[in-house]
A protein has these predicted regions:
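Conserved catalytic or regulatory cores that recognize and/or transform ribose-phosphate-containing ligands
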Residues: 1-180
Length: 180
């Protein structure tokens, strides 16, 4: 059976992050099951927090164990799903995006910070001239650029999920057309 693998790159250290990751991946797994011809392809989503061999924080895994395990999973993936939210992009997520870019693996990013854009309010632009008054969120432009060069950044969870489902539909068709 043909395989499609998605890699979910996200911060995973707080209860909030773990719940968000679990809920999004669970929703994706459910919706992917309803895609046309999905039963003809083995589709999986790797969520690093589910890999207890390296992410059970009460156990021990050193840096090379984590790097090797997650990199192997990432390199076997067809698409990387990257959560870009946070004060800055999580360092692990940024590293995963770099590996994906270097290997030509497409990335679908989610950057949902509500401080994006002016929402038509000119005072937000004027405030940029005042020290410590920026009304806008910050995202590392290098990391964002790597995603955009090899994928797309969405601004809300609905667009994120819809984009993933569309890409998985295309992958299903491509996999089923492959000659063995």
């Amino acid at each position: 059976m043909k395989k499609i693998k998605l890699y979910f790159a996200s911060p995973l250290f707080t209860v909030m992050e773990q719940w968000f990751n679990r809920d999004v991946v669970e929703e994706l797994r459910n919706q992917i099951g309803f895609l046309p011809k999905s039963e003809q392809v083995d589709i999986s989503i790797y969520l690093p927090q589910e890999n207890e061999a390296i992410n059970d924080k009460s156990a021990y895994a050193n840096s090379t164990m984590i790097a090797q395990a997650d990199t192997q999973e990432l390199l076997e993936s067809d698409i990387v799903l990257a959560i870009l939210d946070g004060v800055t992009v999580d360092a692990g997520v940024a590293s995963e995006i770099g590996v994906a870019y270097a290997k030509g693996i497409p990335v679908i990013g989610l950057y949902s910070d509500s401080r994006q854009g002016t929402h038509g309010n000119v005072k937000k632009i004027e405030a940029l001239d005042e020290i410590a008054e920026s009304q806008f969120a910050y995202i590392n432009l290098y990391t964002a650029g790597l995603v955009k060069l090899n994928g797309v950044i969405t601004g809300n969870i609905t667009d994120f999920v819809d984009t993933i489902l569309e890409d998985v539909k295309k992958l299903i068709e491509d996999k089923l057309e492959e000659v063995e």
